[in-house]
Protein backbone atom coordinates (compact mmCIF):
# COMPACT_ATOMS: atom_id res chain seq x y z
CA UNK A 1 0.00 0.00 0.00
CA UNK A 2 2.83 2.37 0.92
CA UNK A 3 4.50 1.69 -2.42
CA UNK A 4 1.23 2.46 -4.22
CA UNK A 5 1.02 5.85 -2.50
CA UNK A 6 4.62 6.56 -3.43
CA UNK A 7 3.96 5.63 -7.04
CA UNK A 8 0.82 7.78 -7.12
CA UNK A 9 2.77 10.69 -5.64
CA UNK A 10 5.50 10.35 -8.24
CA UNK A 11 2.95 10.28 -11.07
CA UNK A 12 1.21 13.34 -9.63
CA UNK A 13 4.48 15.26 -9.35
CA UNK A 14 5.34 14.34 -12.94
CA UNK A 15 1.93 15.55 -14.08
CA UNK A 16 2.30 18.92 -12.37
CA UNK A 17 5.84 19.30 -13.70
CA UNK A 18 4.60 18.59 -17.22
CA UNK A 19 1.79 21.13 -16.81
CA UNK A 20 4.22 23.78 -15.56
CA UNK A 21 6.54 23.06 -18.49
CA UNK A 22 3.66 23.34 -20.97
CA UNK A 23 2.49 26.61 -19.43
CA UNK A 24 6.02 28.02 -19.66
CA UNK A 25 6.27 26.97 -23.29
CA UNK A 26 2.85 28.47 -24.06
CA UNK A 27 3.77 31.80 -22.45
CA UNK A 28 7.06 31.87 -24.32
CA UNK A 29 5.18 31.37 -27.59
CA UNK A 30 2.67 34.05 -26.63
CA UNK A 31 5.27 36.67 -25.71
CA UNK A 32 7.10 35.93 -28.96
CA UNK A 33 3.88 36.47 -30.93
CA UNK A 34 3.11 39.66 -29.01
CA UNK A 35 6.34 41.21 -30.29
CA UNK A 36 4.58 41.44 -33.66
CA UNK A 37 1.61 43.27 -32.12
CA UNK A 38 -2.08 42.64 -32.63
CA UNK A 39 -3.11 41.71 -29.08
CA UNK A 40 -5.29 43.43 -26.48
CA UNK A 41 -4.21 42.90 -22.87
CA UNK A 42 -6.91 43.55 -20.27
CA UNK A 43 -5.49 43.89 -16.77
CA UNK A 44 -7.24 44.12 -13.46
CA UNK A 45 -5.35 46.89 -11.65
CA UNK A 46 -2.41 45.96 -9.42
CA UNK A 47 -2.52 44.98 -5.75
CA UNK A 48 -4.14 47.54 -3.45
CA UNK A 49 -4.28 48.46 0.23
CA UNK A 50 -7.04 46.29 1.68
CA UNK A 51 -7.68 48.70 4.56
CA UNK A 52 -8.81 51.44 2.16
CA UNK A 53 -12.12 52.04 0.39
CA UNK A 54 -13.52 54.35 -2.27
CA UNK A 55 -15.43 56.77 -0.06
CA UNK A 56 -16.04 59.33 -2.81
CA UNK A 57 -16.50 57.10 -5.89
CA UNK A 58 -18.00 59.81 -8.09
CA UNK A 59 -15.03 62.17 -7.77
CA UNK A 60 -12.27 60.33 -9.57
CA UNK A 61 -9.57 62.94 -9.00
CA UNK A 62 -10.01 62.75 -5.20
CA UNK A 63 -7.23 60.20 -4.71
CA UNK A 64 -7.18 60.68 -0.92
CA UNK A 65 -10.59 58.98 -0.75
CA UNK A 66 -9.74 56.03 -2.98
CA UNK A 67 -8.27 52.57 -2.53
CA UNK A 68 -4.85 52.92 -4.10
CA UNK A 69 -1.97 50.64 -5.08
CA UNK A 70 -0.05 49.13 -2.21
CA UNK A 71 3.75 49.26 -2.06
CA UNK A 72 3.76 45.71 -3.42
CA UNK A 73 1.29 46.66 -6.15
CA UNK A 74 3.51 49.51 -7.30
CA UNK A 75 6.63 47.34 -7.26
CA UNK A 76 5.04 44.48 -9.21
CA UNK A 77 3.55 46.86 -11.80
CA UNK A 78 7.01 48.36 -12.32
CA UNK A 79 8.49 44.88 -12.74
CA UNK A 80 5.80 43.91 -15.25
CA UNK A 81 6.55 47.09 -17.19
CA UNK A 82 10.25 46.22 -17.21
CA UNK A 83 9.38 42.68 -18.32
CA UNK A 84 7.33 43.95 -21.26
CA UNK A 85 10.25 46.15 -22.30
CA UNK A 86 12.75 43.30 -22.02
CA UNK A 87 10.44 40.96 -23.94
CA UNK A 88 10.04 43.52 -26.73
CA UNK A 89 6.28 43.86 -26.24
CA UNK A 90 5.15 47.33 -27.29
CA UNK A 91 1.89 49.07 -26.54
CA UNK A 92 0.22 51.70 -28.66
CA UNK A 93 -3.03 52.79 -27.05
CA UNK A 94 -3.23 52.49 -23.26
CA UNK A 95 -6.69 52.89 -21.73
CA UNK A 96 -7.46 52.92 -18.03
CA UNK A 97 -10.27 53.48 -15.59
CA UNK A 98 -10.38 56.91 -14.00
CA UNK A 99 -9.52 55.52 -10.56
CA UNK A 100 -5.93 56.21 -9.52
CA UNK A 101 -5.07 52.53 -8.96
CA UNK A 102 -5.84 51.79 -12.60
CA UNK A 103 -4.15 54.92 -13.95
CA UNK A 104 -0.96 54.20 -12.02
CA UNK A 105 -0.97 50.54 -13.05
CA UNK A 106 -1.26 51.58 -16.69
CA UNK A 107 1.54 54.13 -16.44
CA UNK A 108 3.91 51.77 -14.65
CA UNK A 109 3.27 48.87 -17.01
CA UNK A 110 3.39 50.85 -20.25
CA UNK A 111 6.08 53.34 -19.28
CA UNK A 112 4.06 56.23 -20.68
CA UNK A 113 0.90 58.26 -20.43
CA UNK A 114 -2.58 56.76 -20.52
CA UNK A 115 -6.07 57.67 -21.67
CA UNK A 116 -8.48 57.34 -18.75
CA UNK A 117 -12.14 56.87 -19.60
CA UNK A 118 -15.45 56.33 -17.82
CA UNK A 119 -16.16 53.52 -20.28
CA UNK A 120 -13.98 51.13 -18.26
CA UNK A 121 -14.32 52.76 -14.82
CA UNK A 122 -15.99 50.78 -12.04
CA UNK A 123 -19.52 52.03 -11.47
CA UNK A 124 -20.69 49.74 -8.70
CA UNK A 125 -23.82 50.86 -6.91
CA UNK A 126 -23.32 54.57 -7.57
CA UNK A 127 -24.37 54.38 -11.22
CA UNK A 128 -27.48 52.83 -12.75
CA UNK A 129 -27.62 49.20 -13.90
CA UNK A 130 -28.10 50.56 -17.42
CA UNK A 131 -24.82 52.50 -17.15
CA UNK A 132 -22.99 49.46 -15.77
CA UNK A 133 -24.27 47.44 -18.73
CA UNK A 134 -23.09 50.16 -21.11
CA UNK A 135 -19.62 50.08 -19.58
CA UNK A 136 -19.47 46.28 -19.87
CA UNK A 137 -20.35 46.52 -23.55
CA UNK A 138 -17.78 49.30 -24.03
CA UNK A 139 -15.05 47.06 -22.56
CA UNK A 140 -16.06 44.16 -24.79
CA UNK A 141 -15.93 46.41 -27.86
CA UNK A 142 -12.58 47.91 -26.88
CA UNK A 143 -11.09 44.44 -26.45
CA UNK A 144 -12.23 43.60 -29.98
CA UNK A 145 -10.53 46.55 -31.70
CA UNK A 146 -7.47 45.56 -33.74
CA UNK A 147 -4.40 47.54 -32.54
CA UNK A 148 -2.21 49.61 -34.84
CA UNK A 149 0.34 47.62 -36.85
CA UNK A 150 3.15 46.28 -34.68
CA UNK A 151 1.50 47.41 -31.45
CA UNK A 152 -0.61 45.90 -28.71
CA UNK A 153 -3.33 47.64 -26.71
CA UNK A 154 -3.22 47.81 -22.91
CA UNK A 155 -6.43 48.18 -20.88
CA UNK A 156 -6.51 48.50 -17.08
CA UNK A 157 -9.87 48.20 -15.37
CA UNK A 158 -11.62 46.53 -12.42
CA UNK A 159 -12.99 43.11 -11.44
CA UNK A 160 -16.69 44.09 -11.77
CA UNK A 161 -16.10 45.48 -15.26
CA UNK A 162 -14.18 42.38 -16.36
CA UNK A 163 -16.78 40.06 -14.85
CA UNK A 164 -19.68 41.94 -16.47
CA UNK A 165 -17.93 42.10 -19.84
CA UNK A 166 -16.55 38.58 -20.14
CA UNK A 167 -18.61 36.40 -17.82
CA UNK A 168 -18.56 34.19 -14.74
CA UNK A 169 -15.24 32.53 -15.59
CA UNK A 170 -13.60 35.75 -14.39
CA UNK A 171 -15.24 35.65 -10.95
CA UNK A 172 -11.87 34.96 -9.31
CA UNK A 173 -9.82 37.38 -11.46
CA UNK A 174 -6.92 38.54 -9.32
CA UNK A 175 -5.38 41.96 -8.88
CA UNK A 176 -2.67 42.27 -11.52
CA UNK A 177 -4.05 39.43 -13.65
CA UNK A 178 -4.09 39.89 -17.42
CA UNK A 179 -6.52 38.48 -19.96
CA UNK A 180 -4.89 38.46 -23.39
CA UNK A 181 -7.26 38.74 -26.35
CA UNK A 182 -6.71 38.53 -30.11
CA UNK A 183 -9.28 40.63 -32.03
CA UNK A 184 -10.61 38.61 -34.97
CA UNK A 185 -11.11 41.60 -37.28
CA UNK A 186 -14.89 41.53 -37.06
CA UNK A 187 -15.15 43.20 -33.66
CA UNK A 188 -14.92 40.05 -31.55
CA UNK A 189 -12.23 39.54 -28.90
CA UNK A 190 -10.91 35.96 -28.77
CA UNK A 191 -9.34 34.94 -25.45
CA UNK A 192 -5.80 33.60 -25.91
CA UNK A 193 -4.52 33.36 -22.34
CA UNK A 194 -4.87 34.53 -18.77
CA UNK A 195 -1.55 35.48 -17.22
CA UNK A 196 -0.67 36.41 -13.64
CA UNK A 197 1.61 39.40 -13.10
CA UNK A 198 4.45 37.30 -11.71
CA UNK A 199 4.47 35.12 -14.84
CA UNK A 200 5.35 38.07 -17.11
CA UNK A 201 8.26 38.79 -14.79
CA UNK A 202 9.38 35.14 -14.86
CA UNK A 203 9.09 35.04 -18.66
CA UNK A 204 11.42 38.01 -18.99
CA UNK A 205 13.95 36.33 -16.74
CA UNK A 206 14.16 33.12 -18.76
Enumerate the predicted regions with their spans.
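A short, acidic, amphipathic alpha-helical segment used as a generic capping/interface helix at domain edges
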Residues: 137-147
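Histidine-centered catalytic micro-motifs
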Residues: 43-48, 155-162
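Glycine-rich phosphate-binding loop signature in dinucleotide/nucleotide-binding domains
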Residues: 87-89, 146-150
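Active-site-proximal alpha-helix that buttresses catalytic centers in soluble enzyme cores
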Residues: 24-127, 133, 169-206
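Sec/Tat signal peptide C-region and signal peptidase I cleavage site
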Residues: 18-22
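Bacterial N-terminal signal peptides
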Residues: 9-16
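Bacterial N-terminal signal peptides that target proteins for export
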Residues: 1-9
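Generic beta-sheet signal
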Residues: 38-40, 148-157
Amino acid sequence: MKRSYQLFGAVLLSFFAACASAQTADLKALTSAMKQGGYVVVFRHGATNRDQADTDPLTHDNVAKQRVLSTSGIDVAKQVGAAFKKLGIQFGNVYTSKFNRAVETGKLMSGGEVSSTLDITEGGLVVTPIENDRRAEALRKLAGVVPAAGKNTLIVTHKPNILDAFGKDWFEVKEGEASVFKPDGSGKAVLVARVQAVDWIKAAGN
